[in-house]
Amino acid sequence: MDKSKRPFRKSKRSFRRRLPPIGSGDRIDYRNMSLISRFISEQGKILSRRVNRLTLKQQRLITIAIKQARILSSLPFLNNEKQFERTESIPRATGPRTRNK
């Protein structure tokens, strides 16, 4: 059978294995803010294990470290640094309010 007759055969592509996000020398600790901040989203949420590419044990340790840092106020619970641009303000009607019944 020649190669043109194999419709379901996928070509083999070489892939490069990604490096783990936590090296062997990195210590997972609530004081290591440079490490912890890599696993938090823009809103301040803990990213999932699938996104982080961590092992189960590493994800558990990261989660505990983030929660400890939040309790000790070295990390905010929410990151609400949203920048709103103010456009022209619309004047409100200052008359009496009417209720819709």
From Swiss-Prot:
One of the Pfam families matching this protein, by short name: Ribosomal_S18
Source taxon at top rank: Eukaryota
GO terms assigned for molecular function: small ribosomal subunit rRNA binding; structural constituent of ribosome
GO cellular component terms, semicolon-separated: chloroplast; mitochondrial small ribosomal subunit
Annotated stretches, region: Disordered: 1-23
Compartment(s): Plastid, Chloroplast
GO biological process: translation
Stretches of the chain forming a coiled coil according to its record: none
Keywords: Chloroplast, Plastid, Ribonucleoprotein, Ribosomal protein, RNA-binding, rRNA-binding
Primary localisation category: plastid
Compositional bias ranges of the Basic residues kind: 1-19
Family matches, as NCBIfam families: S18 (TIGR00165)
PANTHER family: 30S RIBOSOMAL PROTEIN S18, SMALL RIBOSOMAL SUBUNIT PROTEIN BS18M
Family: Belongs to the bacterial ribosomal protein bS18 family.
HAMAP family (alphabetical): Ribosomal_bS18 (MF_00270)
Subunit note: Part of the 30S ribosomal subunit.
Protein name per UniProt: Small ribosomal subunit protein bS18c
Organism this protein belongs to: Ceratophyllum demersum (Rigid hornwort)
